[in-house]
UniProtKB/Swiss-Prot annotation:
GO molecular function, one term: RNA binding
PROSITE patterns for this protein: RIBOSOMAL_L7AE (PS01082)
Species for this entry: Caenorhabditis elegans
Record's GO cellular component terms: cytosolic large ribosomal subunit
Full protein name: Large ribosomal subunit protein eL8
Subunit structure comment from the entry: Interacts with cmd-1 in the presence of Ca(2+).
SUPFAM superfamilies hit by this protein: L30e-like (SSF55315)
Keywords: Calmodulin-binding, Ribonucleoprotein, Ribosomal protein
Database matches in PANTHER family: RIBOSOMAL PROTEIN L7AE FAMILY MEMBER (PTHR23105)
Record-stated family: Belongs to the eukaryotic ribosomal protein eL8 family.
Amino acid sequence: MPSKKVIKKKVAAVPAHIRAQTQVQKEVKNPLFEKRARNFNIGQDIQPKKDVTRFVKWPKYIRLQRQSAILQKRLKVPPTINQFRTALDSQSARQAFKLLDKYRPESTEAKKNRLRARAEARAAGKKEEVTKRPNTVRHGVNTITRLVETRRAQLVLIAHDVNPLEIVLHLPALCRKYNVPYAIIKGKASLGTVVRRKTTAAVALVDVNPEDKSALNKLVETVNNNFSERHEEIRKHWGGGVMSAKSDAKKLKIERARARDLGKL
C-alpha cells in the first residue's frame, strides 16, 4: 500500500509594517536604576561565583602536605635531595616488581604451617633435614646498608617518597661506592606490598634462582644506565626555584620601573 504524501503548511510571513514596528521598539528601562561599573576589590562589590578551593580551611595534615609541596617548588633543592624526584620509568618498574614478586617473604600463615609440620616431624622422631634459606627480598634500611657494605646485594630499590628523607639519603652514594646497582622507584607503599607491609623505605635482592638470572641482568643494565652512569649529570642538577605567577608579575613590574627610571636618566 503506497504511503500517504505529507503536505507541510507554510506559515505566512509577518507583514512589513508590523515587522518595522517590532524592530523600532526598544526595551524600556527604569530610570531609578542607575548603571555603574562594578568594583571587585576587597571590601567592594559582591564577588562573582568562582572556584574558592584556594581559600578552603583544610585539615592540618593536608595543609602541611600542600605547604611542603609549595616549599619544594620555591626553595632551591640540593642535588642530593633533588635526585629523589626522578624515579625509574614505569615499564622498568613493572619488570622490577614482576621479578620481586617471585621472591616475596612467606606469609604468616605459611610460616605457621611450616613450623607446625616441622614440630610434628620432630615429635614423630623423624630425622630433621637442614634446608638452605630460600632466596627472598630483604628489606629495612639497616639490613640493606649491611648488605651493600658487604657487597652481597645484587640490586637495591629505594622509595622516592620516604619521610623523613634522611633515612635513605645515604643509600645512593653508598651503592655507588661499593658498585652495587640501585634505583629510585615510585612508592614506599608499592615496595611495602612486596614484603607484606604497609610501607618500606628500601628493598634488596641478594640472590635469584638460575631461571631469573637473565631477567635480573637486563634490569641491572637498565638501572645502571638510568642512575649509576648518570651520576655526574644528577650531581649538577639542582631543583626548585620555581616562583608563583604573583611573584613573577611583581618582579617584572619592579624591573620595568627600574628600566623606566634608567631611561629618564
